[in-house]
Amino acid sequence: MDTVRIAVVGAGVIGLSTAACVSQLVPRCSVTVISDRFTPDTTSNVAAGMLIPPTYPDTPVPTLKRWFRETFQHLSEIARSAEAVDAGIHLVSGWQIFRSVPTEEVPFWADVVLGFREMTEAELKRFPQYEFGQAFTTLKCETSAYLPWLEKRIKGSGGLLLTRRIEDLWELQPSFDIVVNCSGLGSRRLVGDATVSPVRGQVLQAQAPWVKHFIRDGGGLTYVYPGTSYVTLGGSRQTGDWNLSPDAELSREIFSRCCALEPSLHRACDIKEKVGLRPSRPGVRLQKEILVRGEQRLPVVHNYGHGSGGISVHWGSALEATRLVMECVHTLRTPASLSKL
């Protein structure tokens, strides 16, 4: 087999980063990204894009930390390059604050971000309702820039972007030899995974250019994340809620919570409401599977279920998915091909 034809289903940050990795690292392959929605209409476009990873009950912390470290290193290289502005990657410093001392005073990712330390008493005076805090510098990924930048890289490597709704992965055979499923919440329908479900997130995007530092409540529900074009104010976690229409009452509550952390936000203007459905799952699904139908076999690599952590671990999980794709490619190019998969 000469050129291996690879289809990546899904065009959010997981799909595009996986396609970019495969294009870059897998020799003699063609890559086509297939999705019914591309930027700016993906869930990833609503994401605040702060690199602060969550935990998942069924994903081991060492694995999660590796993905986060690889993602942080990848984006740090971009942030130090001339591509930083086009890719929408920059450093941002700030505080994570707690009303009481957390059980885990040092999170697993503390040695990956920059300058992680406990907040001083002087810093905590800014937040009188909080008694403990952490200060650090992390990266912010502006998805409105980063997703088009990834698309450009994919096309620059000879990849294709195809707007199409896939109802069944078997539609992609025999046109493709390997399928990479990065369909996020779509995997509930596409591969019948009932463990992936929506967690509705509503945020506000406001003009407040004087806000330079991020502020994040330790629970992660309330946050103020400054970006290059606007400040993201959040947020909500509504499990099982499929509603994509903004809730005006919730917007008022979010704004009130954020103003309690940063009173100057009362002067913010041009406030927009955004809603996204996070593809939540007990653990990220990153594995190979062989679909069998009669005599036909279709190698599939799954990479979905990142919930609120997609931006934080996208490159690390894309690298792992690419390693699985390479295993599939090796088997296809070996006599007695799919029997070993």
UniProtKB/Swiss-Prot annotation:
Protein name in UniProt: D-aspartate oxidase
Pfam families: DAO
Predominant localisation class: other
Molecular-function GO term, any one: D-aspartate oxidase activity
Organism: Rattus norvegicus (Rat)
Induction: Increased in pups born to mothers fed D-aspartate during pregnancy and suckling; not induced when mothers fed D-alanine.
UniProt family annotation: Belongs to the DAMOX/DASOX family.
Summary of the function given for this chain in its UniProt record: Selectively catalyzes the oxidative deamination of acidic amino acids. Suppresses the level of D-aspartate in the brain, an amino acid that can act as an agonist for glutamate receptors. Protects the organism from the toxicity of D-amino acids. May also function in the intestine.
Class of the enzyme per the UniProt entry, highest EC level: oxidoreductase
